[in-house]
Amino acid sequence: MAEVQQLRVQEAVDAMVKSVERENIRKMQGLMFRCSANCCEDNQASMQQVHQCIERCHAPLAQAQALVTSELERFQDRLARCTMHCNDKAKDSMDAGSKELQVKRQLDSCVAKCVDDHMHLIPTMTKKIKESLSSIGK
């Protein structure tokens, strides 16, 4: 049961990441590469100046990647805390003498609720990421 729930979340997050990559990150990569190429075209610039120019070109993309990573980690941490709470409740039930099958059902139900609750957060997280990305480099 838990594997099915994990797969649901993974597929939803993968779809979100692909959407963000296709619609936002890819454009930023193109800008970064074109900007970097322009840095290299400057025959008057020193090696250090070219390097600094390329670093400036890369900064918005690095910021974007850090933002996406941070949001995904925050989401993952929240989901992990929720499922850890389910595990704690299951352990408490076992310690209180509940039957193993009953505890397993309780755990599966709790984990499914965690996943459902967090699946509903993905569209909001996606919107927040895309809005933040659109303001980077402007």
Curated annotation (Swiss-Prot):
**Which segments of the protein form a coiled coil according to its record?**
none
Q: Which domain of life is it from?
A: Eukaryota
* Alphabetically ordered keywords of this record: Acetylation, Phosphoprotein
User: Residues bearing Phosphothreonine?
Assistant: T124, T126
Q: What residue intervals traverse the membrane? A: none
Residues bearing the modification N-acetylalanine: A2
One Gene Ontology CC term in the entry:
cytoplasm
InterPro entries this protein is in? DUF842_euk (IPR008560)
Family that this chain belongs to: Belongs to the FAM136 family.
Any idea what this protein is called? Protein FAM136A
| Provenance organism | Rattus norvegicus
